[in-house]
Amino acid sequence: MSTKVTLFGQARERVRSALAAMGSGDPAPYIDCWAVSEDATLFGAWGPIEKGHDRLVETFRWVGGRFKSGALVPEDVVAFESGDLAYTVGFEHGEVVVDKGAPAPMTIRVTHIYRRIDGEWCLIHRHADFPPADQRGRSLRPDRGKRQGCRFSCR
């Protein structure tokens, strides 16, 4: 990693910038957000389940190669840190070109887990998927101000 990221907020901003690059086909900044660790894990939205830094790098390069001319923008519903672990839960939204197709909107549900290693916040796990329909017939929608501290309400 080139710049040491010692604050969790800085790590989140670094991931935000890296996802914008990933959506345009450049996986390198996102790869740089990850811990070089054999216990780093990925449960990817397009199917890959990987363990170990080298396997993740290979997969992120494959994912980046599928994107062109877009950006992914994270929307954290929850961000929390305690001690040397932290996590975010939310979505990534964007209009992207995948596999040389037409620009199309994309939304992914994402959980990131961060670990502070030698004073630096690094990603250690990502679990992402395409949100399925709520089988109860409800949809997740913005509902600002309805309940203090809650941005979403299921209806």
Q: Which residues does each PLM region occupy?
A:
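A beta-strand edge to alpha-helix "cap/lid" segment located at domain peripheries
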Residues: 2-35, 39-155
